[in-house]
């Protein structure tokens, strides 16, 4: 009787832990980024003679859609990159560029990611686009039903990947307006494979008002 009671209690505790892991109760809440914070981020180009520049250069004239990639080798990230790239023709019509930032540049990870993403990619080695408060999903992610649904969705879509690089710091997607128009959309990944809504991305991109130079006004 005693062993049965202990066993039943252990099962109950495990069931409760599994239930709680599938709520948002213990997920780190994202801190909204200020425009000034994003503008001041240092980014690098990925060629051998890397050039460092401020992130605001990406959107100061025409706005931009920017993906902060959790890990280029992740098949879930490759799926989202493909989804965002499907918007490229419509973004081109709007004159809005599509970019991505990665937090590390190792092996051929970015090169192998490029076929999935139809925009330029830059290095954010200080991981600022993943802040101001960096959020991590550790092994709890593997007991979340939503994560497994995302896994199966990407697998069924034919996506594959690898385990190279840091993959616990969660990423996101931003739609930036030019100049001081500000952040028009900020999607913070809450769990592995939590993709941005593509309709919301396009709606935000359509709100972008390109900057006109003084010569164009005359």
UniProtKB/Swiss-Prot annotation:
SUPFAM superfamilies linked: Thioredoxin-like
Pfam family, one: AhpC-TSA_2
Active site feature: 74 (redox-active), 77 (redox-active)
Location within or outside the cell: Cytoplasm; Secreted
Example of a GO cellular component annotation carried by this entry: cytoplasm
Main location: cytoplasm
InterPro entries from the UniProt entry: PXL2A/B/C, Thioredoxin-like_sf
Listed PANTHER family: PEROXIREDOXIN-LIKE 2A, PTHR28630
Protein name (record): Peroxiredoxin-like 2A
């Amino acid at each position: 009787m005693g062993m049965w009671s202990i066993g039943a209690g252990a099962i109950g505790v495990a069931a409760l832990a599994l239930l709680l892991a599938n709520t948002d109760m213990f997920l780190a809440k994202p801190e909204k980024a200020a425009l000034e914070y994003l503008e001041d981020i240092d980014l690098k180009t990925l060629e051998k003679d890397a050039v460092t520049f401020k992130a605001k250069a990406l959107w100061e004239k025409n706005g931009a859609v920017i993906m902060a990639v959790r890990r280029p080798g992740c098949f879930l990230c490759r799926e989202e990159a493909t989804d965002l790239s499907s918007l490229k023709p419509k973004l081109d019509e709007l004159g809005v560029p599509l970019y991505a930032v990665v937090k590390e540049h190792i092996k051929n990870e970015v090169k192998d990611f490029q076929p999935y993403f139809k925009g330029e990619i830059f290095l954010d080695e200080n991981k600022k686009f993943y802040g101001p408060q960096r959020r991590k999903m550790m092994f709890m992610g593997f007991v979340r039903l939503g994560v497994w649904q995302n896994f199966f969705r990407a697998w069924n879509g034919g996506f594959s990947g690898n385990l190279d690089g840091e993959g616990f710091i969660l990423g996101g997607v931003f739609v930036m307006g030019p100049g001081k128009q500000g952040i028009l959309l900020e999607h913070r990944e809450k769990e592995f494979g939590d993709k941005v809504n593509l309709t919301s991305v396009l709606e935000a991109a359509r709100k972008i008002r390109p900057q006109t130079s003084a010569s164009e006004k005359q």
